[in-house]
Amino acid sequence: MRIIAGSRRGHTIQAPKGLDTRPTSDRVRENVFNIVAPWVEGARVLDLYAGSGAMGLEALSRGAEAAVFVESDPEAVRAIERNLEKLGLTGARVVRHDVVTGLGQESGAGRKYDLVLADPPYTMTDYHSLLRYLPGVLAEDGLLVFETAAKVEPDLPGLAVRTSRKYGSTRVTVFEHP
């Protein structure tokens, strides 16, 4: 995997070992950032189910002001930390918690994000635990990018679908406040 654009363009990034992490492909990542490009420069980014951190790292490379990576897997957390160090990116914080706990902490602290990137496991079908916090951490004019299996059409009450696109076995749905 590599950073596609921005100040760290072409630099490789490390994915955690094992089968528990499914990194977003370069093609999907490039298309996502084409969609959200106007929101990235100077943005506060929240990368949920961060895995390797590829999405948040891409945002930082493209000019995001800050990124918070939420990931529960210890090997993935180490990969994110190594990638941040290797790329020399600043303005990042890694939160080692399950996503619901991490979201609760961010929401409880009153933190708002311009761009929220969520890539839950494709086997996940119940998003109700996320619904409690997602709308609350999204800035008024912010976007939520939600990656799922192509057959899933997520519906997040309190948020409106801006666009939804399929890329092979992946669906990317972009939400905003109505």
Question: Can you describe what each PLM-predicted range is?
Answer:
Residues 1-178:
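Class I S-adenosyl-L-methionine-dependent methyltransferase catalytic core
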